[in-house]
C-alpha cells in the first residue's frame, strides 16, 4: 500500500508468492482541489499582507487535510476487508515528534500520519493486522528489478524504467512494499541453514532498503527448488 503524491493511495492485493490479485487507486480529486485552492489563497494573502493573521487560514487548511486523510484511511481499510486481506502493509513513517520543513510539506507528511492512524483503527475493527516496512527506495527502484527509475517530465504520475518501459510510479512502489513484507515474513520463519542458503542464492533479500518485487519472485522460485531437493 503506497501513500503517493499523485494519488491519495495505491493498494495492491498480493499473495506470498507475488501473485497480484487486485489493485485500486484511491483518490479524492474534488477534496484535493479544494485544499489546493485554499493553499493558493493563503500564498497570495502572505504575499500581500505578510505572515500575520494567517493562523486561522492555516487551521482551515489543516482541517481539510485531516478530513481527506480520514476518508483515505477508511477507504484503504474497507478495500482490504472487501478483499479478505489478513494484513495491511505501510511504509514506516516516524510517528513521533515535530515535522520540520515548509508548511505544504508538513501538511503532506501529516496527512500520511493521519491516514495510517485512521486505517489502523478501522483495520483493527475488521480483525486485520497492520505492518510496516522500510520506506527507502520503494519509489526510486523499479519493481521489475531493472534499477533506479526516472520521472516522466510530462506526466509526474509515470516513471520510466531503465528498459524504457513506462509505469505508474505509485503502483510500482506498492508492489515493492508488498514484496518487502513477504520477503521478511518468509525469511524469518526459516531454519538458519535454509535461510543462509536462500540468502546466498538471492543476496538482494538481505538488503531491506533495496529489495523489490522481482526479488520476491526469485526468492519464491529458489525456495521451491530448495523444498523439492
Residues covered by each model-derived region:
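Positively charged, low-complexity nucleic-acid-binding target-recognition regions
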Residues: 105-106, 110-229
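Substrate-contacting helices/loops that form the catalytic groove of nucleic-acid
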Residues: 3-112, 190-229
Amino acid at each position: 500500500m503506497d501513500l503517493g503524491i499523485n494519488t491519495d493511495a495505491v493498494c495492491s492485493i498480493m499473495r506470498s508468492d507475488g501473485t497480484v490479485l487486485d489493485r485500486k487507486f484511491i483518490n479524492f480529486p474534488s477534496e484535493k482541489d479544494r485544499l489546493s485552492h485554499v493553499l493558493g489563497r493563503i500564498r497570495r494573502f502572505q504575499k500581500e499582507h505578510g505572515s500575520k493573521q494567517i493562523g486561522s487560514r492555516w487551521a482551515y487548511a489543516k482541517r481539510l487535510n485531516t478530513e481527506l486523510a480520514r476518508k483515505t484511511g477508511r477507504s484503504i481499510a474497507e478495500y482490504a476487508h472487501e478483499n479478505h486481506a489478513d494484513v495491511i502493509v505501510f511504509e514506516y513513517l516516524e510517528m513521533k515528534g515535530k515535522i520540520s520543513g515548509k508548511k505544504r510539506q508538513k501538511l503532506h507528511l501529516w496527512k500520511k500520519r493521519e491516514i495510517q492512524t485512521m486505517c489502523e483503527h478501522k483495520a483493527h475493527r475488521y480483525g486485520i493486522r497492520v505492518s510496516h516496512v522500510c520506506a527507502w527506495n520503494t519509489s526510486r527502484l523499479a519493481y521489475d528489478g531493472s534499477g533506479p527509475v526516472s520521472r516522466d517530465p510530462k506526466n509526474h504520475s509515470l516513471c520510466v524504467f531503465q528498459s524504457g518501459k513506462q509505469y505508474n510510479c505509485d503502483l510500482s512502489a506498492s508492489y515493492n512494499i508488498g514484496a518487502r513484507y513477504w520477503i521478511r515474513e518468509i525469511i524469518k520463519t526459516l531454519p538458519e541453514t535454509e535461510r543462509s542458503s536462500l540468502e546466498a542464492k538471492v543476496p538482494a533479500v538481505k538488503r531491506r532498503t533495496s529489495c523489490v518485487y522481482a526479488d520476491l519472485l526469485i526468492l519464491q522460485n529458489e525456495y521451491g527448488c530448495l523444498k523439492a531437493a
